[in-house]
Amino acid sequence: MKTDKQFTPYKTPKEVLDAYEKIHQTMLPHVKTMFNRVPKTSFEIRQTEAFRAESASAEYFAGSPDGTRPGVFYVPILDATTFNTTGGMESLFLHEAIPGHHYQISLQQEDTLLPKFMRYGGNNAYVEGWALYCESLGKELGLYTDPYQYMGALGDEMHRAIRLVVDVGMHWKGWTREEAIAYMMSNEPISEDGAVAEIER
């Protein structure tokens, strides 16, 4: 699947961004039935700026509480022709964008009943826990109908489980860098460069 041309259909960065917008539009009607409160903060999908794209991962930047700056889901696209659709595009959108980080952070900032340290402070366990939970809502939100996208979501889950094993291996069992890289490469479809990046992050 990593090399099959059917999974790299894009020619331009705009086509990749349009694919994410299609995910957004597909799940939006379902989100409205699941959430009775949605953020006032607007939302955009943008390509990561060229100056930082090589070292960036897909990420969410929070909007401003007063709504003057939108929340932005950034997607690094170095070469659209190699952008693989099986990498869990739908699960990534659910995690980083809606209802993941965009809903959680925006609603938290907009809640004037919360003390400021709770409105603007980050609790990473909660932030990431919510985003991971949102990935599990794919089917309820009209996504994961393509078996390859669902497989991508399961692959993301496996990757996180492997990260936990490697973390314990390195910090408790004394694994070397090479042992950690080898474990990742033997238990998931990750390149050596990808495994090195994970170990050294």
Give the predicted meaning of each segment.
Residues M1-R201:
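N-terminal maturation segment of proteins
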